[in-house]
C-alpha cells in the first residue's frame, strides 16, 4: 500500500496535486486531521476492499496547531506499519502567493480582522515547519503554471517504476531564479553560449545544431566529465542513505541551451548505472 501526504502553504498547488493523484487512481482526502493519519492507515490495511491501495491525503494549516506539532510522531507511527509513505511539500515565495490570492480573491484560512494576508502567509509557513522539515519531496511552484505543475507532479510522484531513490536532473535559467528544492546545483554560465551565435539562438540544447556546437567546445566537455564523475561517485551514497528524492539542478543564463544540453546528456549517462533517473527542463517552453 502507498500513502502520499500532501502539504504546503495555501496557494502553492495542493488542490492541483490531489486532483492529479485522484486522476491517477488514488483515493484522496482533503484536510485530514493529522491525528487521524495512523487510524486511516490502519483501516486501509484492514479493509483493502473498501479503500484503494493508493491513498493521498492533504494535511495543512487548517489543522489545530497542537496537531501539527505532533505530526512527526504521527508520521513515524504510520511508517512503523510498513506502509510506503511519501511526504510532499509544496511552496512558493511570499510575493507569488500574495499574487495568487489577489487574482483568485479567495480567503486565506488564517486571515482575520487582526491578521493581514501577508501575515497569514508568513504565519502559515511557521505552523507547517514540523511537516516541511520531514518532507521527502519539496516542489517550489513559484515559476510553474498549472500545466507545468501537473507535469512536474506526474514526473516526480507517478513516474517511479522501481523502489529506491528517484533522481531528477533539471535544467534551469538563473534569470528566472534558482530552484529552491534542488539538492545539488551546478552553475555552467562560464561555458560558451550558443545564444550569441545568430544561427543557433532560436534552437535549444535538445536540437542537433546546438548539441554539435557544444560537443566540440573543450570547456563544455571538461565540465560534463567533471560533473558526471562527481555524480557517479556521490549519487549512490545518497541512495544508500534512504533518500526518496534527489534533485540535481544544472543552470545557465536563460535555461535554453547549455544547461539543457548538459542535463539531457548527464541524464542519459546516469541511466546506465542508476535506476529512476528523470530529466526535466524547467524553463524550456
Swiss-Prot record:
Q: Where is the signal peptide?
A: none
Q: Name one Pfam family in it.
A: PapZ_C
Q: MF terms per GO, please?
A: ATP binding; GTP binding
Question: Any idea which positions bind ATP?
Answer: 8-15
Residues annotated as binding GTP are 60-63
Assigned keywords, A-Z = ATP-binding, GTP-binding, Nucleotide-binding
Domain of life here?
Answer: Bacteria
- SUPFAM superfamilies given for it? P-loop containing nucleoside triphosphate hydrolases
The family annotation for this protein states: Belongs to the RapZ-like family.
* Entry-linked HAMAP family: RapZ_like
Q: What does this protein do?
A: Displays ATPase and GTPase activities.
Protein name as it appears in the record:
Nucleotide-binding protein Avin_12760
Query: What is the protein's species of origin?
Result: Azotobacter vinelandii (strain DJ / ATCC BAA-1303)
